[in-house]
Amino acid sequence: MDMDVMMISMCILASTFMAPGWASTSGFLRVPQSQSIVENEAADFGCEATDSASYLHYEWLHNGREIAYDKRVYRIGSHLHIEAVQREEDVGDYVCIATSLASGAREASPPAKLSVIYLESASVQLLGSNRNELLLKCHVEGASGDEPLQIEWYRDSARLASWGNVHLEEHRLLVRQPSPSDDGLYRCTASNAAGRVMSKQGYVYQANIKCLPRLLKKNQKLPESWGKQTFLCRGKRGGSGGLDQALSPAPEDLRIVQGPAGQLLIKEGDSAALSCLYELPAELQNQRIQLRWRKDGKLLRHVELGGALPIPGHAHDSGKDALLREDARLVLHKQNGTLSFASIIASDAGQYQCQLQLEGHAPLNSSPGLLEVIEQLKFVPQPTSKNLELDAAVAKVHCKAQGTPSPQVQWLREGSLNSSLPDQVEVDINGTLIFRNVRAEHRGNYTCQASSSQGQISATVSINVVVTPKFSVPPVGPIETTEQGSVVMHCQAIGDPKPTIQWDKDLKYLSENNTDRERFSFLENGTLEIRNVQVEDEGSYGCTIGNSAGLKREDVQLVVRSTGDGFAPEETGGDGFLVTRAVLITMTVALAYIVLVVGLMLWCRYRRQARKARLNELSIKEAGGDQPDASVTNGKGSEQEPCLSKQRNGASGKPKSKSNGDAQKSDDTACSQQSRSSKKSVYEQLVLPRSGLSELLQIGRGEFGDVFVGKLKASLVATSAQSDKDADTEKQHSNSENGSGGSGSGSGSGSTTLSTLNEKRRSKTSMDDIEEIKEEEPEQSALEQLVLVKALNKVKDEQACQEFRRQLDLLRGISHKGVVRLFGLCREKDPHYMVLEYTDWGDLKQFLLATAGKVNTATATSSPPALTTSQVLAVAYQIARGMDAIYRSRCTHRDLATRNCVISSEFVVKVSYPALCKDKYSREYHKHRNTLLPVRWLAPECIQEDEYTTKSDIFAYGVLVWELFNQATKLPHEELTSEQVIQRSQAGTLEWTVAEATPDSLKEILLSCWLANPKERPSFSQLGSALSKAMQSVAEK
């Protein structure tokens, strides 16, 4: 019976598979469907001919060719599965072919098309620009399948829509009759299922306006042709106002033969050159002609071509529209107008244009050129290993990569792809590895891979699942015992890894090596047992538990009673008397406590009101009016200034006393907390009005904000100097009063000794002492003082605020000619400004590069001569004296290098703190543990333990002297990457050698600056003495 049924089925199947093929798709129950898949996601094509699948064989064709199956593309039954679709390999038509095993008949399904959705980059292209319209196109490298790309346009930061004279048509933006209100930076964004990208470079548009030019000469008359149609056009501050368009055109024989190329694609780190070949007629040789290079419409570099005086600057060539930053990478060649880049960085991308400016004529512009930078593939920042708390709801490990084109990021676990990651572990679109409900099986090694057309990079991190240590049996106290008794203090903990337990007494660690083993026993479960207790055992005992997840601590007080202590029994009274006595004592103590509390409340209220009254009086005196400062009367100073409100003095000028157990802070690790007699905030004493600053020009960006160079009114400089003198006088007066008061009436010998020492100091004052104590007075004849202004932009970043306060405290307490002065602090509104002394020659490193011939001097015919050995020694000696002053003020610098020193035209060098770590000197900093650090100048203990001392400044000073003798033309260990420098420094294998030009008498002491043991390094006074002897020996030769 079964055989008959099988034969009938075979006959029906054979009749279905009619040669040469089946009719249309009637034989298919399910055919593959066309689909669009996001790149790197999976795709599935279904195919089913009849319910009797066991008598059919299925094959798949891709673009007419049979598919070769592998681990990524494979068949599941009759269906086709593609893992991680790739657009270069998988795009096309897919056909399913079913073959009958009985008859051999074949039938093919209709082709199903696979489209890959991806999105790489976007850029803005100029299609046309004139007075009547502006036409831009958003060019996108990507595909969206059947769905259109979503294009959005932005002017500056405002999103545009079709309204008024703005029209959006698919990928194009049309602005009809553009006006000054349409000026700005135009950028576009593109989005689809694969993500969203914004154009890295945009198009800067500036409307052309006919305006009245200013009179260049006295009594100059207007042309009659202007007549009544002449209007005065006032533009906003910083704008050009279109004045150039009203000037007469440039002569025809003055022309730019060749401008920058239309589009230039350069890899990051390579060199590049933008050409601007010009022709200058002989009759214009003595005219005022200036060659300018602009980037995105802003002035970048300029050089005088003619023999006359320089052309006065225009309003649009200064202030915010100028990019005249000191950058040794950029060189403008006067002979041919070429702008060359020594090493391209990502921020160099943009639109460049050169122009010739002849006095009294409109500028002659070249055609614009677009410079695009192929950013190197790298992790920003490098992924790091992490400890995850067990049962945490969400934990993330970030992996961000940058490059051109944008890289694709994926995570692997011990060689497996994303699909085989553990349960509840996923990767989001930004490449972040997300753990949900962390479990023990999540621990292991994970590798982040970033790939693009440049190649592939990877970083492996270790994920460890831990449990924060907790006390299962905490120590309980206080504990009282008698002398020669026994005490057991329990301390047990749980956690993963198993926590370690450490006991200490009065903050001094206890172990079997420093205790009496016959009396002290440390049990395995963490319990501490003390037998035969002595009086000296009394104190505060602490139990600290910890593992890789953290530390916890509990204290217990041990009180030891002498065997003779206690109350004698009452001889005459009975039990009733004892009870009555106990009740009376209890009631007396309670009443005294109540009276004490009420008295303290009244006293505190009185003191608070008196303090408010004194603050109001001080604020009225400072303001010179009758209204007190709102920050004092309302008590809102801390809300208005969250960064600087924590540094306040107490009610008295005396420092808080420390307990015996508190270790005194080292003078090498932190600034000492000196007593202050003033009750105002130390930062209120530094306040300068923001209106006193002028001509601010940004020179770079630091860790907590922008850095400017500007000018400060001389009257404010004199006021700042006088306030510093008053503060020093008041401090000396308070110190003398404290010294006399502490001696008492019976300390006449002490006062005599003090006066004798003062007489000796006055009689033995040397030139070195005068140099150290003397404060530089500002020139009274000068109306303005050149200053360096550091802005605190990251007001809500606690780490940035802490560094801002540290630099304020560093420079506030030092008055030495080798260290720049802190003129004051502008904090009426955000951002806060720190105002420091600056010099006319500026950055010491740029000065060294100029003397070495590495910096282009636009107006000079030849580079300045190189420094002699005696001059280099003089510079090093001045810096050593300044650093010695910082050491004696019990502070550390932490970033000593030639870039952070300034030099004047009088060859006076001062230690400063510009710290331009974000752009100008970004190559000299490296992000380590989420902080930008000058790793090539840091001592090993700074990198390993984050421990900064004067000895670490000595290490950096040795590197600075190495820079001086090398003219700052190369970086320390420039053959190594920053990661390799960190690794070798931590391993102790980083070898230092002095520069070749170093005198022999200095080599030994400079090599000792780089010793691994900080205690073996010399002091700044020893370095100063060695430099002084070296200068004498060089002078004698």
From Swiss-Prot:
Annotated organism of origin: Drosophila pseudoobscura pseudoobscura
Keyword Signal belongs to the record: yes
InterPro entries given in the database record: Ig-like_dom (IPR007110), Ig-like_dom_sf (IPR036179), Ig-like_fold (IPR013783), Ig_I-set (IPR013098), Ig_sub (IPR003599), Ig_sub2 (IPR003598), Ig_V-set (IPR013106), Kinase-like_dom_sf (IPR011009)
Disulfide bond annotation, renumbered to this chain: C47-C96, C138-C188, C276-C354, C399-C448, C491-C543
Main location: membrane
Biased composition (Acidic residues): 768-777
Listed CDD domains: Ig (cd00096)
Residues of the Protein kinase domain: 693-1031
Extent of Gly residues compositional bias: 739-749
Start-end of Polar residues biased regions: 658-676
Organism ancestry: Eukaryota, Metazoa, Ecdysozoa, Arthropoda, Hexapoda
Protein name as it appears in the record: Tyrosine-protein kinase-like otk
